[in-house]
Amino acid sequence: MREDYESAPLPFKSWKQELTFAGAGLTGMPLYYLMENIALTYSQASNVGVIVSIAPVFTAITARIFLKEEGKLQPAFFIGCVIAFIGISIISFSGTTMHLNPIGDILSVGAAMVWSFYAVLSKKMGAFGYSVIHITRRTFFYGILFMIPALYFFDFKWDLYRFSTPAYIFNIFYLGLGASAICFVTWNLAVRILGAIKTSVYIYLAPVVTAVASVIVLHEKITFLSELGIVLVLGGLLLSEQKKKLFLIRGRKHTENVVE
């Protein structure tokens, strides 16, 4: 019965819901991936990966504005953000081996901002009461719909010969199933359970994984300044989250003392 329900098409209920799905499809797929992938043509993978990791900061601010989550953002949160931005700056301006390119860095920051809107829309979609599979399918529908016009603005050519290459087929399979379908399903499920801000916290691990992968797969060189920048980014973002928790704990203890 559950399989029949999830395989059935999602019914139309209201234009408000459809606009939410469309907004998620636009921000989560074409805008985010185009900005990130174009950034990769200007900057190194490790550089882009670290800068995009500031998405949780934008998500917290966006969620505060549109979802009223987590209450008021405390000063400690912004202190952590400043530390993270210092780390990002060190990575972006760390010398010749990182191939400084402001265009790539700006596009990476833009991708992080776009993702924050997708995270908030994911939370709104989760409140519609549909299954995660239904939500992901409808989001993908609009994402592909918005992606088609982009083909006319880029040098896109059909080359069926490429599909005879095992590496090419593997890359498409990995990006389509692993990095897209599975990731979007698990992301939407996590947002439904944890919320937009808490789920975005796990993006903190992205620069570490990206930096390691760029060394192993792409043979990129990571300088000492880059390593320092990564530490500051992760430390600053984690500090802002921990400080928020400490603030809530202190507030709770203060309330208990007043009651006593």
Where are these regions (language model features)?
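Membrane-interface helix-cap regions at the ends of transmembrane helices
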Residues: 1-13, 65, 85-99, 142-166, ...
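Specific transmembrane alpha-helical segments of multi-pass solute transporters/efflux pumps
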Residues: 3-52, 83-84, 90, 176-194
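Helix-helix packing/entry segments at the starts of transmembrane helices
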Residues: 29, 45-54, 121-144, 176-216
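C-terminal transmembrane-helix exit sites in multi-pass transporters
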Residues: 55-79, 208-227
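Hydrophobic transmembrane alpha-helices of multi-pass small-molecule transport proteins
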Residues: 62, 73-94, 204, 225-244
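Intrinsic disorder in cytosolic terminal tails and internal cytosolic loops
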Residues: 244-260
